């Protein structure tokens, strides 16, 4: 019953927020539910780590497009950790220092060859055959919303996982 409740909450959030504005706090709450569902599905094959601040400082609850974290975690599972039978790991980290919030989603999966990563970036985050559309949509929506306040970088090496790293600078009045 608990999994059914989490699944329905996640679906409702996705339907309500895919084209709307949400908040960082809502994104964190929903990725927590998504992780619980994936833990049941994957068992001990993949470990999830959610790092949210250092416990000392409150992270600003900034407005942001909805459904940002879930597609990135889904990409990690589908592309990086698809064949993993044990010791897979997905780390979602949200930190803040002064007026800069950093968000990263990384995995320890198969990664990408440097030339494939370069091709992904040069082709506007889309691969031939239409793969990585979730990554494309997330990056486009973030760039449209935050404009020059956000920097997004991708890091990967074959056999060494994949990371999407975002740095959001808040305007302080």
Residue ranges and their predicted role:
Residues 166-172:
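C-terminal beta-strand of the catalytic ATP-binding
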Residues 1-153, 162-165:
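Two-component histidine phosphotransfer core
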